[in-house]
Amino acid sequence: MKILLSTLCTVAILLGLTGIPCSAADKIRSLCEIHYPTDYLYEWDCVKVTGKDTPYRIFGKQWQDGLRFNRMDRRHFLAGMSVKVPRHMEDIKEFNPMPPFYLDSGKEPKVILIDQNEMYLGAYEYGMLVFSAPVAVGVEEFRLKNGSYRVDAVDLRHESSLYPVEGSERPYPMHYGLRFHVEKVGDGWTSYWIHGRDLPGYPASHGCIGLYDEEMQLEYYGEPAKPLLMDAKTLYRWAAGEGSAGNLQRVRGPMVIIMGEPQIPPERVRPVPDAADAPGVSRGPEAPR
């Protein structure tokens, strides 16, 4: 029955027949179960979060590094969740698992490298890393094929035309949107974006790539009170330029390279509906999601 429901759900989304996201069948409760190649460079303990815990209480002054190490945001740091806590926090100062150089970028001035095995993104200028960030990637049945893409449109305040915020009629926010792929699906077109969203610490989207956007979380969910994690904004400004207007613009932006596979049993997770995570379905490549 679960397989049938999952299949029907997938078909409905791809054909644009449903207006609400499919519910998550299983949400990961232990991020210790997810293994990254760089995990083995550090000594860490699996710690179960209690109702009194905060990122600062668990990770100390390097709480942002601790969240990045777990590829999660503050909204998902909840009681009952198990997280990886490095025994020596100084070892993950300014945590970054991406290589300092990407020599395969050729003559491309800017490249966005998305390593799904690490669930991390690196921004490169002429092969040199200038910025990195944890990401939320697609679950198996929605995940894009590894390969080369290119940012062809930007939209500062992009919103979903397919899904509303859960429990409301307000469109899902996909702020700081960088569109990097459009493909024909049935009678429509599906678009994929890099944009701000929730980061639960495991694959959770319908194909888009998500980064920290605590300004969006405060606006739509009322927390955190003081936005600090703003990787989506940083990447957008780097890719689109400081002078980019707020409306949808066609551009020839950075090359996007997707590689690797998340190291998690695919049956454990389904798309999570509490974030702007679904690709767009439109009637032509010019129509934004």
Say what each PLM segment does:
Residues 26, 162-289:
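Exported/periplasmic cell-wall-interacting domains
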Residues 81-83:
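Structural motif
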Residues 89, 95-140:
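A structural motif detector for short, solvent-exposed N-terminal "entry" segments of globular domains
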Residues 7-16:
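Bacterial N-terminal signal peptides
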Residues 29-62:
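Primarily a LysM-type cell-wall glycan-binding module
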Residues 1-6:
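Positively charged n-region of N-terminal signal peptides that target proteins for export
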